[in-house]
Amino acid sequence: MWLGAYTWLNVFGILLQAAFIQNILLANFLGMCSYLACSTRVSTANGLGMSVALVLTVTGSINWFVHAFITGPKALTWISPSLASVNLGFLELIIFIVVIAAFTQILELLLEKVSRNLYLSLGIFLPLIAVNCAILGGVLFGITRSYPFIPMMIFSLGAGCGWWLAIVILATIKEKLAYSDIPKNLQGMGISFITTGLIAMAFMSLTGIDISKPSAKIQRAPLETEVVENTTNPLKESSSKHQPSISKARTQRRSL
């Protein structure tokens, strides 16, 4: 339930994969609107990225329990075995969005009290975290992959940190581009998309690293075992055929 067939090395692989290899923004293009709009300054991008990472991590963990004990197949058997046939999967998206919206509202109230400047700089994009497709997409990705709780929490953390890292990198580059001589036709969205593509290509350099699969499920393929058996059986048969002739030759040598 908590870790399943995953080892801690696999959990680290899930974190690495969610943050870099399958970045929720650069590989899946989720959350692009706030990514492009709030990346003009590093301070604003850092605050929004931190908020998205926090919301995605917490809501991903909460929604895992929702799926496991309320909306998933046979999820209500913990109440009574007779409820095994009841399936509340049609309510899953609604409950997920309600959980995300509720936690976003709590985060908005906390930021208004703790950091008024960050609250004002984020503006309308802070309450829009509730409908940010990166949040709901990250939760659904983890649920459809049937992660246990700890891998699900780490996946949500990695996806949120990957989005945070991407927007901070773009904001840093944009601050440098403000003092550069950019061609007129590429100013604004044009140079932002080009920069985003280059960042995505840099993240793709880690594609070959794949340690996120559960180690306990790694077994030899059936086809491979059949090939090995077929190649070893003729050797056994040939050795058994030649065994009588070899023993006969040995007895003749001894008699001589």
UniProtKB/Swiss-Prot annotation:
Bias (Polar residues): 229-249
Membrane-related topology note: Multi-pass membrane protein
Subcellular location: Cell inner membrane
Major location (coarse): membrane
Spans through the membrane: 1-21, 50-70, 83-103, 123-143, 149-169, 189-209
Keyword Transcription: no
Catalytic activity: a ubiquinone + n Na(+)(in) + NADH + H(+) = a ubiquinol + n Na(+)(out) + NAD(+)
Job of this protein: NQR complex catalyzes the reduction of ubiquinone-1 to ubiquinol by two successive reactions, coupled with the transport of Na(+) ions from the cytoplasm to the periplasm. NqrA to NqrE are probably involved in the second step, the conversion of ubisemiquinone to ubiquinol.
Family the entry assigns: Belongs to the NqrDE/RnfAE family.
NCBIfam families in the record: nqrE, PRK01061.1
Protein name (database record): Na(+)-translocating NADH-quinone reductase subunit E
Organism expressing this protein natively: Chlamydia pneumoniae
Organism taxonomic ancestry: Bacteria, Pseudomonadati, Chlamydiota, Chlamydiia, Chlamydiales
Gene name of the encoded protein: nqrE
